[in-house]
Amino acid sequence: MKRFVRTVLGDIDPKDLGICDCHDHLIKNWGPEAKEHPDFVMLSNEAAIKECLEFVHHGGRSIVTMDPPNVGRDVKRMVAIAEQLKGKLNIIMATGFHKAAFYDKGSSWLAQVPVNEIVPMLVAEIEEGMDLYNYSGPVVKRGKAKAGIIKAGTGYAAIDRLELKALEAVAITSITTGAPVLVHTQLGTMAYEAAQHLIDFGVNPRKIQLSHLNKNPDEYYYAKIIRELGVTLCFDGPDRVKYYPDCLLAKHIKYLVDLGFVKHITLALDAGRVLYQKHYGLEKGKECFGFAYLFERFIPLLKEVGVSDAAINTILVENLAEILAFDAPRQFNPKAVHPRVLALKKQLKIE
């Protein structure tokens, strides 16, 4: 099988991915996050394009936007942005789910539709084209742009029954299509468990990234996850001093590199609010950092704490060329699922 990465404008050779921000946001068209803070509404194509051009100016080549259906995803706007940046920047979009708090526990389609019917919906987004209406119903209208990654999400310090259901659907979809997976972990909690569940269902650990571990600054926890499960940690939060200073994240990355775990580290900015991006901020009359922060501030800090240029290249380029490349599709084997996750499904009354 010829290896490929699936972008909005078509499949590319993994070698053409270049420096990649593996978890970010350019457009967020309302959704449940907007109820938490108005900064989660990001609807300026112009600001998004300017931000991307700064990323390109500093050597960036690819961005993975991690907005699943019904949580801010806007396929039409993103395709328009990708077309304007064609030849300069690769954009990858997501299908899948976020944390359970964003879905009605009784009436959402995640709650009502069985896993064996959800999986074909996700597979279709990857193999046929994303639904322009985000599976909001009752009409499905597929565009040409296909999803290139699957998102799952877990809440703070607990995995909800809807989240385990989504993890199962995401796992089967990954196995069926070969697509990679990224998991939102709320404040870096339940990361080990989420990864273990995906692996128990049969997902290739090399295709799993765990997001937001930087918000749970525990280098021993990081090492345990990598050592025991073989998955990758996506540190997506330089420029988040409200959680921790950059120096702490840089030192934790150095710690993992020194342990020999450089192949299990990726970096991103997760700049999913208006005031996390320079050009959105300027439109609001604010001076903010943006995508350039990674290159101007954080990468120099990594070098200052002793992370080598070779390790940085592995983190930004080589790892993602491997992780984001699709595996050969496999047939899901329910008999191979680990008994421990089946027991948990029974305890949580997931059919």
Swiss-Prot record:
Binding site for Zn(2+) 2: K151, H184, H212
Keyword Hydrolase among UniProt keywords: yes
Residues annotated as binding Zn(2+) 1: H23, H25, K151, D270
BP GO terms, sorted: catabolic process
Residue list for modification N6-carboxylysine: K151
Cofactor(s), names only, from the UniProt record: Zn(2+)
Cofactor comment text: Binds 2 Zn(2+) ions per subunit.
One GO MF term attached to the UniProt entry: zinc ion binding
Signal peptide feature range: none
Bridged cysteine pairs (disulfide): none
Keywords on record: Hydrolase, Metal-binding, Zinc
Family to which this protein belongs: Belongs to the metallo-dependent hydrolases superfamily. Phosphotriesterase family.
Name of the protein described by the UniProt record: Uncharacterized protein MPN_497
Species annotation: Mycoplasma pneumoniae (strain ATCC 29342 / M129 / Subtype 1)
Lineage, highest ranks first: Bacteria, Bacillati, Mycoplasmatota, Mycoplasmoidales, Mycoplasmoidaceae
